[in-house]
Amino acid sequence: MEISILTDVGQRRTNNQDYANQYKNKAGKSMIFLADGMGGHRAGNIASEMAVTDLGAAWVATEISTINEVREWFAEYLEKENQQIHRIGQDEEHKGMGTTLEAVAIIDDQVLFAHVGDSRIGLVRNGEYHQLTSDHSLVNALLKAGQITEEEAAHHPQRNIITQSIGQKDELQPDFGMVTVEAGDFIVINSDGLTNMISGDEIRDIVVSDLSVEEKAKTLVRFANNAGGLDNITVVLIHFAEEDVA
């Protein structure tokens, strides 16, 4: 398994509120977290880094090696982190603090994920890009209800409003999903700074190119910057080879 994690401030922002990292537990199983923070001053930076590092430290301490154990772990620890960030967000200096979260566990040839907010997870298989997550956003809710079109959604003035985040008062309702990976598959995890700037077709074209995994990640970020780079851009690209899925 090859993995590249890349984050970039983009063209317009002065600080980077995205955070991503990979952790291995005592059973040697990998979990990748990506978070896109929000909140004034430095609250967004703190929320994203805290969610990833807290959950990463909790994962490292486990000996989890089965899908069912991952499910139970997600159910307990995502809500714990939600409450912790919500508590800190009550301080004046951390007001409005919260973060999206993508958590991706790799158990042999099974990829189990949890999704909160409008960062995304995608699968590139046989030359096609498939979005595996559905944005927890106001615009996506309007789109699903048939109140706006895809075209209107892309330029909607409230497209940055998310309906779920780590740090909210209410109990989290994450989406969970699982995919059995095949040799040659790529998993793409990204903040909205990528997918607000480039299309799924562009992501697919870069991912299926002959570049190395690291160069593919760099190219994705470069394309997003060339398209305007309106937000921080974070990409995690994972490639599964024959020996990873045998």
Report the location of each language-model feature.
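PP2C/PPM-type serine/threonine phosphatase catalytic domain
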Residues: 1-246
